[in-house]
Design a protein with these regions (language model features):
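A short, sequence-level motif marking secondary-structure junctions
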Residues: 64-71, 89-91, 110-111, 203-205, ...
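Short Pro/Gly-enriched beta-strand edge/turn motifs at strand-loop
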Residues: 47, 118-122, 183-185, 199
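Bacterial Sec-dependent N-terminal signal peptides
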Residues: 1-24
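N-terminal mature ectodomain segment of secretory-pathway/periplasmic proteins
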Residues: 26-101, 136-137, 142
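Flexible, processing/modification-adjacent segments and terminal tails
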Residues: 22-27, 33, 92-163, 190-192, ...
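Hydrophobic alpha-helical segments, especially N-terminal targeting/anchoring helices
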Residues: 17, 66, 141, 173-174, ...
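A generic structural signal for short beta-strands and their flanking turns/coil linkers
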Residues: 45-47, 131, 167-169
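Gly/Pro-enriched, hydrophobic low-complexity segments
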Residues: 79, 147-244
Length: 256
């Protein structure tokens, strides 16, 4: 009798897990359908966004470029200067130092972690199983007055101080239209280590048949955040290869 109860419990647990996975996949299917279709997203070769970030009342122009082959960068325009951040050319990750304005390569660990991000163009959930990711429907949750589905996404492990750590994000999908309105994840390093980072998305608009959020915020959960307004999005932009290259003059200085 005990054996029968144990088997029944196992079957129930397995059935519940399968139903949960199917429900999470159904939510994603609705999401992709509502924003333009999975195949249309997969056909993208690149995205270029022009935006403005509001930081302490100051509007700072921001340009974001992401390409299908993994190359990407952000360009901040501040006091008439262009400051490149998070530039990845496929091998090297580098940024301009805000104080010296010189280009500096990132440490090996940061570069390896950044490389993992290239798997997520143009969307983390596309072909998630092939990437080795897992998803789980955690239930429902109200975010800023909106009822949402909470989906847990587990990506490839990150390396933090030489140790592998699970990379987990929680996505909150609006129950009415199935688009994500918030993403939460634990900060793994720096002064805010252990705190929860939250990104919010709203004002979805169509660009060449695909819907993107044109209003975003980034900050700590239940804390201050920096609003970002997208002014334009260009799909499949033409970007020169040298745009991502670590500056030659810096390379020459290292040789001398």
């Amino acid at each position: 009798m005990k054996t029968l109860k144990w088997i029944t419990a196992i079957v129930f647990m397995a059935t519940t897990m399968i139903a949960s996975a199917q429900t999470a996949d159904e939510i994603l299917d609705n999401y992709f359908e509502n924003i333009g279709g999975k195949e249309k997203l997969k056909s993208l070769e690149g995205i270029k966004m022009m935006a403005k970030v509001n930081q302490q009342g100051m509007e700072i122009p921001l340009e974001i470029i992401q390409l299908k082959d993994g190359r990407q960068m952000s360009i901040i325009t501040f006091q008439g200067k262009q400051i490149k951040q998070g530039v990845y050319d496929g091998e090297t990750l580098w940024s301009h130092n805000f104080m010296t304005m010189k280009a500096e390569k990132s440490e090996a660990e940061a570069t390896e972690n950044f490389k993992l991000n290239t798997n997520d163009f143009p969307d983390s959930f596309i072909d998630y199983k092939e990437k080795g990711y897992t998803i789980e429907l955690m239930g429902n949750e109200i975010i800023d007055g909106t009822e949402t589905y909470k989906i847990k996404l587990v990506r490839e492990p990150l390396t933090v101080d030489g140790n592998k750590e699970e990379d987990v994000s929680y996505y909150f999908f609006d129950m009415d239209n199935f688009v994500p309105i918030a993403v939460q994840s634990e900060i793994k390093s720096g002064q805010a280590k252990g705190m929860t980072q939250e990104i919010t998305m709203s004002d979805y608009q169509e660009v060449d048949g695909i819907y993107f959020p044109f209003a975003m915020t980034q900050g700590l959960k239940d804390g201050p955040s920096n609003p970002m307004t997208i002014e334009s999005i260009e799909l499949n932009p033409t970007i020169e290869d040298g745009f991502f290259t670590f500056p030659e003059e810096i390379i020459e200085e290292e040789k001398n």
